[in-house]
Every structure is written in C-alpha cells, then in structure tokens.
Amino acid sequence: MISNTMKVSLGMAIGAIGVVATPAGAAALDPTFGSAGTTSTAFGGYGAAARVVIQPDGRIVSAGQNALGDFALARYTTSGALDTSFNGTGMVTTTLSGSCSGQARALALQADGKIVVAGASCPNFTATRNFTIVRYNADGSLDTSFGSSGKATVNFYAGASEAYAVAIQGGSIWVAGYAGSGFALARLTGSGTLDYSFGSGTGTVTSTVGTSSALANSLAIQADGKPVLAGYASSGGTVFALTRYTTTGALDTTFGTGGKVLTNVGGTFTGNSAVATSLAIQSDGNIVAAGYANSASGGYYRMAAVRYTSAGALDSYFGSGTGKVLTAIGSGNAIGSDVAIDATGGIIVGGYSSAGSYRQLTLNRYDPYGNQDYSFGPVATAVGSANAAVQGLAIQSDGKIVVAGYGNSPVTFVVARYQ
C-alpha cells in the first residue's frame, strides 16, 4: 500500500519551475498564473503542500510541513505571487513542541477568514503522536483565542493518533484520522476545546472498522450535519472504508451496515489493496470517494473513484452499473489524492501518475455517470527532473482548478492552476 502522505521537507524562495505539460485533452496550465501556470515555494529545506483552499476573494492558501516538522503555510494572490499581506512574506511556519516532528495534513477555511490546519505532533515532549490543530488569523498570525496560544491537541488515550482531515461546520471544527488501529473523530468548539455534547460526553469517538487496522483520510459534513469519514480498512487485503455518524457521535445505522461500508474496489485476490484518500458529497446527497486500487496481484495501482447513495449502497448509475471506476494513467502507478465536484457535476480527481522515472502532477475528470471525460484529459505535468504529485485540489468560482503538492529537486511546495 502506498501512503497518501510523503515525509518531505521544504528553502526560502519562490520561483519558476521547469515544467513540461503533457495534456491528453483540453485541460491545460493557466499561463496567467505564476510562471506558465505553476509556482514553487520553499521554506528552508525540503517540504510539500498537503492541501489547498480558495478564499472568497480568490486568494489561494496551501498548507503542509517543512524539514523541521513545522506546520507551513503559503498564501498566493490570484496571479500566483506570494501574498505579502500574509505575515509580510506570504509564508508562515509554526514550530510544535515535542519529541517528534509535526505533520500537517489537512486545511480548512472558516467563514470569518481564519485558517485551520490539522495534523499530528508529540505534545508535552512525549513520544506519542496526538491530533494537533492550529488556527491562524487571516493575516497569518496565530489566533491566540484558540486552544493554547493558537494550538490545540486531542489525546484519544488509545495509543498514537493522527489527524488527516478537518472540516468546519458553523462554529464547530471536526477533525478525523486514526487512533490506535481504528477510525477517530473529534469535534472541537470554536475556542479549541473538545465539544462535550458530542461522543457520549468526551468530544471524541473511535470506531473499529474492518478486521485489524483502519485509518480515515477524509471527512465531509452532510447538509443534515452528519459527518462522513472515508479511508481504508483491513478486510482480506485493504478496502475502501466509510463510516457515518449522527450529530451526537453514534454510528448512523441508516448508513451501510451499522454505520459502516467496506468496498473491495479492484477485485478479490491475494494482495488486493484499495485506499480512499478523499471524499466529496454531491448536492443530491450521493457520496464520492476517490483514491487508488490495484486490479491484479502485483499490478500497478490505478486511480479510483467510487460513488455511493446516501444510504451507503454502491450507486448503480455510476461506473457502468458497478458504482466503481478504475483508470490506468501513465506507465506505472496512478494515485488519486483529492477529489472535488465541479459546477456541472463532473468529478475531478488529482494525484500523480508515472512517466519514465518520475511521478507527475495528474488530473482526471469523470462525468456524472463515471465515464472518462476525454475532452478534459487525463492531464499530467512534469515538474523539473524529479517526482511531483498533487496532494490537494480546489475549484475556483470561474471553474479553474488549483492544485497543490510537491515537486522539484530539492523538493518544494508546488501550486499550479489549470483552465
């Protein structure tokens, strides 16, 4: 199984990157953004962006980590330049105390413009990772009204726990990942304390999913306030795993089997592996999970998208009646890392594919029925002579697609925009 995160680090500059775009369809780099559609930002070493969001004013925020395990953020203008109204440089790093490096994996924007980043660190100089959430003001400064000087941690008391996803709902902050060997979910108040009206008075819930281990990579909140988690679980190999909870933290028994859904995406064989890395909820309530799966023992991973009804059943209107699509892209593994729904109901998946010795930024689009949209791509972009990958994507109000991830050698934040 391939992890959807990569421990890389970040050097203090922004500049053009050598890119060669190889679109197979109409999607192409936007030449009005950065240098020929891309920009790179380094934070003093090596590093990578994990996620990206678009502010209402069109400015772009990406978050990840640097070589020291600091949380790292960059904000860009609509043209791809670093926004100097953000911490004076367009960049922010936050050091987290503890005996292990921090890892920032998730990013969300509040309605008031505050920025929430979630991941993991080892607080109080312990060796055990805990959920870690940091909130910033719109100018990039730490929001000292949140947690302890802008930082909050959640200990599930079940061994190590790490956050991989964050979502904002009203005044609540939802954070999901794993604790011990199961799915983990916490709800925080706007001040960064656990919300004790959730999870039987604890503010947290954990769920055993599958047979041995499970991890939630993504989180979305339905219109009715119910949280949906997606990731993977062990079950005769690894499979897409989803859970849905009530607003008070109980597993929602109207979803799947007892609130859980397990999907073998590529088939049943020795070594079958499938991981949901991302999740989106359509306006009609259907749920789209994207990631990757293999379809033969020892075979390459393929980009995967699976659609479920609001009850957790595979959607027979998607993927030629199966509810599932697998797409081979490039000459090796094709990994989906993030998903978004566009204004027409199309499903955009970003990740990476292989071409020769290197990974490339990769975007793919499916129509609302799961058919490959060849008028779009897939499109792959090489970033220098080095591995590159999309780890997060967001769609602007004008339909342009912004992706964030890593590339170059030494490795840096990479942000690109497609039209």
Regions found by a protein language model. Name each.
Residues S9-V19:
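Bacterial N-terminal signal peptides
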Residues S3, A21-Q419:
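Extracytoplasmic mature domains of secreted or surface-exposed proteins
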Residues M1-L10:
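Bacterial N-terminal signal peptides that target proteins for export
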